[in-house]
Regions:
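Short acidic/glycine-rich loops and adjacent helix/strand connectors
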Residues: 1-397
Length: 397
């Protein structure tokens, strides 16, 4: 079976610019699907993958990944006629009713998020490809599939965290016997990934691009200075979920699109926002350190709760949010898991691969494989200080 997985939501940013003129350029990037890519999977094996941005001389792009698709086909020595399915790593169809509440949302769904919008792009760039061979896979399921099917394991806990999928900010799956069973979803209004990205934006960086800068700044800051703010802002619940009242603040449709109320609250209760180009001061490093500490607290809370609930001792992390060395270190120290696997493609490029792997798994078994990214095992000696030694790692060939 030959499947091309794709990611990206063409026209999302252009739609926002037309619907809400006058925003800051950085505010238009509070959007999904800006990492278009393609991956070719044949009989459950990844053959080739590529980012669309590489072909249009951009850092990131949301445009339909036709150049990446053509590259994948060329590298495999096949044509589009040989492809059994195209799988997209977003599926907004179940939430169509949510976009019928106002005219702008309805138009956003029609022009950007709907199946018909995707089919129009396929027809434009791949004329003649049958629409019945085009499928959608929910975003977090695509992320989970990418991680689970490349882990080499038959059974594990899968935790997906990013700013948001279709409506989720964090999802937990039980992977067993080649199937992904969703056991918990947390909505974007309580997304720790979304809060992390908004704090990065507040400190003068790009949303969904520069979060790594926040993580780097955190190493120089003192988290205690703003710890109380984040302890109040992010509530850990007994059922393994979290609640973030800050993200539930809403005003107009326009304000909701750019998280305006939450950002005003950050400005009033945390620190005055830093504009790009302004000096980075100690106070900004302290904010970053407190946000990082909060993020780690949430990921550990979720992972540990569902480890106890399921009894699973292996965990896979997927999505853009958990790709941090600090998070991995805290999970190792927690001793809730014997081994941790980090998805080698945590961003939306991984969702393209995951969509293809998931669609393949519905009709045939995915071949077992050793992972192509490090396996991080738990510290073998109880009481041994993990700061004094490197983790054991195993690499695939």
């Amino acid at each position: 079976m030959k499947v091309i997985g794709i990611s990206g939501l063409e026209n999302f940013i252009d739609f926002k610019k037309a619907a809400w003129p006058g925003l800051e350029e950085r505010e238009y990037r509070i959007a999904q699907g800006v990492d278009a890519s393609a991956a070719l999977v044949i009989d459950g094996n990844l053959v080739v993958a590529a980012d669309q941005a590489r072909f249009c001389v951009q850092t990131r792009t949301a445009q339909f990944p036709i150049d990446a698709i053509r590259f994948c086909l060329s590298e495999a020595g096949i044509t589009i006629d040989a492809i059994d399915e195209i799988a997209h790593g977003f599926d907004f169809a179940p939430y169509r009713v949510l976009y019928a509440q106002d005219s702008v949302s309805t138009e956003l769904y029609r022009r950007v998020l709907s199946r018909s919008a995707l089919l129009d792009q396929v027809s434009r760039d791949l004329p003649g490809f049958p629409e019945e061979k085009v499928f959608a896979v929910s975003h977090h399921r695509a992320h989970a599939a990418c991680a689970a099917f490349t882990s080499g394991w038959d059974e594990c806990l899968v935790v997906v965290s990013d700013a948001m999928g279709e409506i989720e900010g964090l999802s937990v799956f039980d992977f067993h016997d080649g199937e992904l069973e969703r056991i918990r979803s947390m909505y974007a209004r309580d997304s720790i990934g979304m809060l992390y990205s908004l704090v990065a934006l507040h400190l003068g960086f790009e949303f969904s691009t520069d979060e790594y800068k926040l993580m780097e700044m955190a190493a120089y800051g003192d988290p205690s200075r703003f710890r109380s703010f984040f302890l109040e802002a992010v509530e850990l619940r007994d059922d393994g979920s979290v609640r973030i009242p800050l993200l539930r603040l809403t005003n107009t449709r326009r304000d909701r699109e750019i998280c305006a109320a939450a950002r005003v609250s950050l400005d009033q209760k945390l620190v005055r926002r830093r504009l790009p180009g302004e000096p980075i001061e100690f106070i900004h490093e302290d904010v970053a350190a407190a946000m990082q500490e909060c993020f780690e607290r949430v990921i550990l809370h979720c992972c540990e709760h569902f480890a106890r609930e399921t009894g699973l001792r292996k965990v896979v992390l997927a999505g853009g949010a958990p790709l941090q060395a600090a998070v991995k270190k805290k999970l190792i120290r927690s001793r809730f898991f014997d081994v941790i696997y980090i998805s080698p493609a945590g961003g939306d490029d991984g969702a393209a691969l995951g969509a293809a792997l998931y669609r393949t798994s519905l009709t045939q078994a995915i071949p077992a494989r050793r992972p192509q990214a490090p396996l991080i095992t738990a510290w073998p000696d109880a009481g041994f200080d993990p700061d004094l030694r490197a983790p054991q790692t195993s690499f695939g060939s």
